[in-house]
Amino acid sequence: MEKDKGKYISLFYGLSFFGTVIGAIIPTVENWGVTTAGSANDATYIALFILMVMGSVVACCISDPSRVIRNDGSRVFIPRNTTFVQELKNIVLAIKREPWIILFFPYSFAGLWYIPYQSNDFNGYFFDLRTRAFGSLWFDFGQFAMAVVMGMLLDLKAIGGRRRRAFVCWGVLFTLLNAVFIGGVFPARISHRGVTPPGGLIDLTDSSRAGGYIALFVFYGCVDGAWQTFAWWIAGALSNDPLVLSIYSSFYKVFGAMGAAIVFSLDVRGVSYQGMFGSYWGLLAGSMLFVFVLIYKRVHDTSVLLTGAVALEKADEEPSNAAKGV
């Protein structure tokens, strides 16, 4: 249901990020005694592999979509299988039907840009091994917590209608993002490739430095958690049609993967840490401006009357239940 989209999106990302929290506990425990810049031991990777296998087994227990019933008694729409050619046509038709979705592409492109800077250029540069693991644990917790908080805000009726909530939460995310990156300017200025951090690697017992750097790393996680939840909620606010939403989600994933491939290439090529940081901040803040226009133009208090599946099905077929707003 429209009123619960934020809740279920945050539930999805909350569970996902909670899994990373559990996963981060393993390297933290396994490498607790390592105060050098080494790499994780074999036991860490074995434990993580076992955890992933367990997750795969649990996924087999997911209920069949035909058995899922909403709170209002209606059943979820199950789209029929289509051919690869039809899927390509659907993408073109979806953009023709909703050309404003193009404004979502920059936001999608920036969605995974954070990975090399945060993991390699900040966490990997400033901390010793056990502090990296310890910081990653709290980074993942920040992702988890902020994903849940953002989902709750997006559904909070006290703020107003859905359109108003979109603008308010956009403001929250934009403010959080820039506040965190202003704090990130200071460590970025003193980090250089091939050079040990001033004062040496930071260990979590170094009370004069560890607290501030770990806190900043946690807030980077908070930005990412809020970013991902807001992305899926905005996409969900544009339509209720699962056929259309599946295409929007593919846009987010494809452009995000494209951005990740590019930024990892930049990192491998040795772009300065300042350049990596600047591109990270600039892309995120700049793409938020495009999303603001998208909200202004296309996010309404309801999408029930908006259709999409009609354009993506054969013209002579009846509209799907999803297209009717179910």
Predicted feature locations:
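Helix-loop junctions on the cytosolic side of multi-pass membrane transporters
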Residues: 60-75, 187-191, 293-305
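Short, flexible helix-coil linker/hinge segments at the edges of structured domains or between repeats
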Residues: 31-92
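C-terminal transmembrane module of eukaryotic multi-pass membrane proteins
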Residues: 215-254, 258-265, 271-282, 287-293
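Symmetry-related core transmembrane helices of the 12-TM Major Facilitator Superfamily/SLC fold
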Residues: 11-17, 41-62, 107-108, 171-180, ...
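Glycine-rich segments within core transmembrane alpha-helices of 12-TM secondary carriers
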Residues: 2-40, 44-55, 107, 111, ...
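Membrane-interfacial loop- and helix-cap regions that link adjacent transmembrane helices
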Residues: 54, 62, 75-249
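A helix-boundary/kink motif common to multi-pass secondary transporters
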Residues: 35, 40, 158-165, 240, ...
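Intrinsically disordered, low-complexity terminal tails of fungal membrane proteins
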Residues: 68-84, 300-326
